[in-house]
Amino acid sequence: MKTEGLHHVTAFARDPQENLRFYTEVLGLRLVKKTVNFDDPGTYHFYFGNQNGDPGTIMTFFPFQGSGQGTVGKGQAGRVYFSVPSGSLSFWKERLEKSGLSLEEKTLFGEKGLIFDDTEDLPLAIMEDAKSGKSEWTPDGITTNEAITGMKGVLLYSYDPQATIQLLTESFGYTKVAEEDQIVRLASSAAVGGVIDVHLHPEKRGVGGYGTVHHVAFRTKKKEQAKWLPIIAENHLPSSEILDREYFTSVYFREKGGILFEIATDEPGFMTDETFAELGTSLKLPEWLEKHRQQITDILPEL
């Protein structure tokens, strides 16, 4: 089996309004779905992505105002990399610095990028990537020559880096393509969301909270999802059953390095309950929560 790369990455945030502002107004992503955490309906679940919310472009957040700050470290995904067109780094450097962010210009595996944290300390990077195409979602001040095209990949901090690398190469179809500065780069054939970096010697233990990643989701077709269950079991990794998340179905498991992984389907996508023009404009609830809409909206912070 081979995954088609990343489906989405989900992280914790604290302030829902600030989370919305930063990812839509500063990074220029589209809010493609505003819903709730199905396991905790008193917490929003925001999905940001390209114009359609295509797999591989999606960054999602659980913003919980009562959350304490987390610590990025072992047992987590660390930095999330976004792709932008070649030649656009100077634009992003100016834009991010105007937003008050501290940046580090860095070349990773021969690719130029900007390393920074978002306004709630989640580690991010913007990397030039000629292979990722261009985005049609261009909010004010951003053109197709600069707009984020999707996720490039993530950096993993594993308790057992070699076991994580073995799982991704032997069971998920990734290939080791390079190693530098104690980081191994793995790649799939996906043009968007195709890169996984694994740090060989992470130091700190990760602690969940705002500013940290909750889980990393990999893509699959719906007809292929059940085939992943025996693969996960063969690696002696307990998994969830297949869960309906409205816009995809999911299987969750924690790999041997302590990182929570998900296998998520491309189908049905985010236009099951909203048109293209309506995406992200209203609070959407699954049918089983719709009868509790008033109680839920009374709890949720006003945006």
Curated annotation (Swiss-Prot):
Keywords: Aromatic hydrocarbons catabolism, Cytoplasm, Detoxification, Dioxygenase, Iron, Metal-binding, Oxidoreductase, Repeat
Oxidoreductase found in the keyword field: yes
UniProt-annotated binding residues for Fe cation: H8, H215, E262
Entry note: cofactor: Binds 1 Fe(2+) ion.
Major location category of this protein: cytoplasm
Cofactor(s), names only, from the UniProt record: Fe(2+)
Phenotype caused by lack of the gene: No visible phenotype. Growth is not inhibited by 2-methylhydroquinone or catechol.
Domain VOC: 5-129, 150-266
Membrane-traversing stretches: none
Listed GO CC annotations: cytoplasm
Family to which this protein belongs: Belongs to the extradiol ring-cleavage dioxygenase family.
Name recorded for this polypeptide: Putative ring-cleaving dioxygenase MhqE
Source organism (scientific name): Bacillus subtilis (strain 168)
Gene name linked to the record: mhqE
